[in-house]
Amino acid sequence: MLTAEEKASVISLFAKVNVEEVGGEALGRLLVVYPWTQRFFEHFGDLSSADAILGNPKVKGHGKKVLNSFSEGLKQLDDLKGAFASLSELHCDKLHVDPENFRLLGNVLVVVLARRFGGEFTPELQANFQKVVTGVANALAHRYH
């Protein structure tokens, strides 16, 4: 659970995020760092190298879509399970995504935010974001339980 101040800090920083760039980088890094996650994206074309993945327009497009969903979830921080119920159902029942991948993507997102925002991404802000990405990962994994 986040305090009102913690929520405000997350929302304030996220308002500065370019979802297309950050989403593409986060998903791209996930696919590079954890290559077994690529099996869910084989239809995206060339995923043969880090350069191919990070330059792949389908990876960038889906990363933007993922971050837009994350952004919508920030509007419902007190009901993340409700906010992500339909996506949890899709990823569990139709796509059969390993729920551990949600945690991995959240951690990669924190890395990308730290890289992009440098000193502005303080340890306290990192802790707040870590709470949020953990909550989102748990909400997305909810259907699996």
From Swiss-Prot:
It comes from the Eukaryota. It holds the Pfam family Globin. Residues 1-145 form the Globin domain. GO terms for biological process: hydrogen peroxide catabolic process. InterPro entries: Globin, Globin-like_sf, Globin/Proto, Hemoglobin_b, Hemoglobin_oxygen_transport. One of its GO terms (molecular function) is organic acid binding. Heme b binds at residues 62, 91. SUPFAM superfamilies: Globin-like. CDD domains: Hb-beta-like. One of its GO terms (cellular component) is hemoglobin complex. Keywords: Heme, Iron, Metal-binding, Oxygen transport, Transport. The keyword Transport applies. Heterotetramer of two alpha chains and two beta chains. Belongs to the globin family. PANTHER family: HEMOGLOBIN FAMILY MEMBER (PTHR11442), HEMOGLOBIN SUBUNIT BETA (PTHR11442:SF42). This is Hemoglobin fetal subunit beta. It comes from Ovis aries.
